[in-house]
């Protein structure tokens, strides 16, 4: 931990949030047990990662209760402090959010990973209406909104635990405010309070089961197939090459959302595992796909397109993999999305600094396998995170190509707002690094109802029945996890 003198020196350099860090051994705990001890209440989060579908990433992140958060819906933003609105803004929320983030000047913590606090949460799909370069082409008609969640919700994370899964150590991070005369002392006291919480045992909430329920499609199979045929008509007319319609399913779910996270992380380990408690609703997900990642001046997108079910035996698994890589339709769709990713990254990158690294590799998850590629670029000077978001949002894999025309068609054919689905979840650090996953393989739990949404890439030779089945396959991991909870994880 830095000394009072070091703290004062950093304050003199103009930093208005200064991290105090304490390192402890926590090798007898897991990220889940630590979350139960330190957080497990509204406006907290747990973020984990599984690399290559096989091993947990080095770091996990637990956000302690956030006193400040922003909610944006339409052209209005509310800033909350301890549950009370303390600031409001009318107009495009994105410049306001960027300015809010930029209020905080913090030194880096060299010994820790790139994320050690900042804005954490989501940008829902309807954020599209705030990007001026294509919003004027979208009608933004009033649609049904079964979930009723904000378009954007971001927490200001100033107290967190960074878990090093390799060493078994936990790094407690509390930001001190040097504008307060006793800011340093208050942060030290807060660290001691958190240490006390760690020493206490926590009650493990057992999942003993509940009544079994079935997921019901909002769209319905036949209307969805008709939607696929309508999109094919647009494709044959030359309007577009691909569109990704989606359908939402819902089911009664009265169990703990944290139990759902336990089941999902076991059933479908993914590069982005996340649990957000927003008070009146929860987001639980295991997304395989980056929307965009910024690390200093490098930017990465990672398109995923092309799907097969996992085989029941190694031989069947290999056969499915070979079948996927030899499927001309799937390869053509994936190449189109690589080109879209190159175009998106190229808008914000220096000339000649965009490259495809991993190209058409297979990644395997619990229920499905995908074709994946990596597109990287070196940012132009002066690019902001909102410039990056504007260039990459929404993902081509969730919209289609050309992107804007595909979004117009989605707006026409889908019956309700997408909400969180198809948007982005993740972190925007104080250091301006950003790591956002696409909100897929993601459940929203609200009012004892679980919602999950999934899409299918429709091209000229798509079969409506196959595209309907693809949406079922993609939602299967979340629905199976919910049914595991209903059967009882701890019986």
Swiss-Prot record:
Part of a heterotetrameric complex that catalyzes the two-step biosynthesis of anthranilate, an intermediate in the biosynthesis of L-tryptophan. In the first step, the glutamine-binding beta subunit (TrpG) of anthranilate synthase (AS) provides the glutamine amidotransferase activity which generates ammonia as a substrate that, along with chorismate, is used in the second step, catalyzed by the large alpha subunit of AS (TrpE) to produce anthranilate. In the absence of TrpG, TrpE can synthesize anthranilate directly from chorismate and high concentrations of ammonia. GO terms for biological process: L-tryptophan biosynthetic process. It comes from Neisseria meningitidis serogroup B (strain ATCC BAA-335 / MC58). Pathway: Amino-acid biosynthesis; L-tryptophan biosynthesis; L-tryptophan from chorismate: step 1/5. Feedback inhibited by tryptophan. NCBIfam families: trpE_most. The gene is trpE. L-tryptophan binds at residues 49, 271-273. Its EC number is 4.1.3.27. This is Anthranilate synthase component 1. Keywords: Amino-acid biosynthesis, Aromatic amino acid biosynthesis, Lyase, Magnesium, Metal-binding, Tryptophan biosynthesis. GO terms for molecular function: anthranilate synthase activity; metal ion binding.
């Amino acid at each position: 931990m830095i000394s009072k003198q070091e703290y004062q020196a950093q304050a003199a350099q103009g930093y208005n949030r200064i991290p105090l860090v304490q390192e402890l051994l926590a090798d007898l705990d897991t990220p889940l047990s630590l979350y139960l001890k330190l957080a497990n209440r509204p406006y907290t989060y747990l973020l984990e990662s599984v690399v290559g579908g096989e091993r947990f990433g080095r770091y996990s992140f637990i956000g302690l209760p956030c006193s400040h958060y922003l909610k944006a819906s339409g052209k209005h933003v509310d800033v909350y402090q301890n549950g009370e609105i303390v600031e409001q803004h009318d107009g495009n929320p994105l410049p306001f959010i960027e300015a809010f983030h930029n209020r905080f000047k913090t030194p880096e913590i060299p010994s820790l990973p790139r994320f050690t606090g900042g804005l954490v949460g989501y940008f829902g799909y309807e954020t599209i209406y705030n990007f001026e370069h294509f919003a004027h082409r979208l009608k933004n008609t009033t649609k049904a909104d079964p979930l009723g969640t904000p378009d954007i919700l971001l927490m200001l994370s100033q107290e967190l635990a960074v878990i090093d899964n390799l060493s078994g150590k936990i790094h407690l991070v509390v930001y001190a405010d040097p504008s307060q005369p006793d800011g340093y002392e208050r942060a030290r006291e807060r660290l001691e309070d958190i240490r006390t919480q760690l020493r206490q045992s926590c009650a493990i909430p057992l999942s003993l089961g509940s009544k079994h329920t079935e997921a019901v499609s909002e769209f319905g199979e036949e209307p969805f197939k008709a939607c696929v045929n309508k999109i094919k008509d647009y494709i044959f007319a030359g309007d577009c090459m691909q569109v990704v319609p989606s359908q939402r399913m819902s089911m009664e779910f009265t169990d703990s959302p944290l139990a759902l996270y336990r089941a999902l992380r076991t059933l479908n380990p993914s590069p982005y595992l996340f649990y957000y408690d927003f008070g009146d609703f929860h987001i639980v997900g295991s997304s395989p796909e980056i929307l965009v990642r910024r690390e200093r001046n490098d930017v990465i997108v990672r398109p995923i397109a092309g799907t097969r079910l996992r085989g029941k035996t190694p031989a069947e698994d290999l056969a499915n993999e070979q079948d996927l890589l030899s499927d001309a339709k799937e390869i053509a769709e994936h190449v189109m999305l690589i080109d879209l990713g190159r175009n998106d990254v190229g808008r914000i990158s220096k000339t000649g600094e965009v490259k495809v690294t991993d190209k058409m590799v297979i990644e395997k998850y619990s229920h499905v396998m995908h074709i994946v590629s990596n597109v990287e670029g070196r940012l132009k000077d002066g690019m902001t995170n909102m410039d990056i978001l504007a260039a990459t949002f929404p993902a081509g894999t969730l919209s289609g190509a050309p992107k804007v025309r595909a979004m117009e068609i989605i707006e026409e054919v889908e019956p309700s707002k997408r909400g969180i689905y198809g948007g982005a979840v993740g972190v925007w650090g104080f250091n301006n690094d950003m790591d956002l996953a696409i909100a897929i393989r993601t459940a929203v739990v609200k009012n004892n109802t679980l919602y999950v949404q999934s899409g299918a890439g429709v091209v000229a030779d798509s079969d409506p029945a196959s595209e309907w089945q693809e949406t079922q396959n993609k939602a299967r991991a979340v629905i199976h996890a919910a049914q595991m909870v209903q059967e009882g994880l701890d019986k």
